[in-house]
Regions:
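Polar/charged low-complexity regulatory segments
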Residues: 1-36, 94-137
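Amphipathic alpha-helical packing elements
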Residues: 34-77
Length: 137
């Protein structure tokens, strides 16, 4: 299902994948525009906040105060952890491959089947699944 205002998992803020999507989910939920089945604060959102070493509720509070994505990311760096270039490289590689030959592969196969994508060999990762699922109207 296409959701206006929800960016791709692949899009980067400050070089970091998924962070912008987490912010979008926070904002959309506050506006009542995020479907209930979108995990908030768990799954990849939780991984992202753990990577930055900030608590999800604190990120929600800061995001809803306003500011650009870059300002909120800088807040995360100040309150939590500013990852180095190599850490970001490893994070991005890890996240963009989730679902491909790992512990998320079973979940991905189930979700593909539920959404009618079982035949889609191009969907090999969770990020690919998000992209395909959200392209559907």
């Amino acid at each position: 299902m296409k959701i206006s205002g929800l960016r791709s998992s692949y899009e980067k803020v400050g070089g970091i994948v998924f962070f912008g999507r987490t912010l979008d989910k926070i904002r959309l939920h506050a506006q009542g525009k995020l479907p209930a089945d979108y995990n908030r604060g768990t799954g990849f959102d939780s991984r992202c906040t753990r990577f930055l070493k900030v608590e999800y509720p604190a990120l929600v509070e800061r995001t809803l105060q306003g500011g650009t994505d870059e300002e909120i990311l800088e807040w995360c760096f100040q309150k939590g952890h500013r990852p180095g270039e190599e850490e970001i490289l490893v994070w991005n590689a890890f996240m963009t491959k989730r679902g491909w030959r790992d512990d998320v592969s079973g979940w991905l196969a189930q979700e593909k089947k539920k959404r009618g994508f079982a035949h889609r060999d191009d969907i090999q990762t969770a990020f690919d699944f998000h992209k395909a699922d959200e392209a559907e109207d």
